[in-house]
Amino acid sequence: MSRVGNKIINVPEGVTVDIAADNTVTVTGPKGTLVRQFSPVITIKQEENVITVARSTEQKTHKQLHGTTRALLANMIEGVHVGFKKELEIVGIGYRGQMKGNTLVLNIGYSHPVEIEGEEGVTIETPSNTKIVVSGISKERVGQVAAQIREVRKPEPYKGKGIKYVDERIIRKEGKTAGK
């Protein structure tokens, strides 16, 4: 059984955490500010540079919220301090992506270019025609934008063409063999 909720969270230098009475947590750091409201069942305490998360009862839902709250808080602190980044790769002949202002334009085998608008708080870059870098301070939003980009053309199992994460392994299938 996981004990994620019982682990303490260390607050690095340059990051400030403000906990309001209604369990709204504001985390400010060199990269920006994140605000989130947590369940009143969970108590969040800060003592100097250490944050602890505790639950009021041993109910199953409270145990689940305990671990989730701790993980979300740790991600908020890491995001404003270091930030998050997801890298995608475009595989396929003639497939490419480029930025036009705040819009990512993908030419990936459809009869029309696919345009994806950038979100507030998330930066999309194209260091080359076949590489896309999504970065920001919110792990959730960075992952969501990267997933939306990948969803436009998922990698197919026969040739591996499509948009994939850099560290993703595509399970390949063998094509049909010709009959006699």
Residue locations for each model-derived region?
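N-terminal intrinsically disordered, cationic/polar leader segments
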Residues: S2-A147, E151-K180
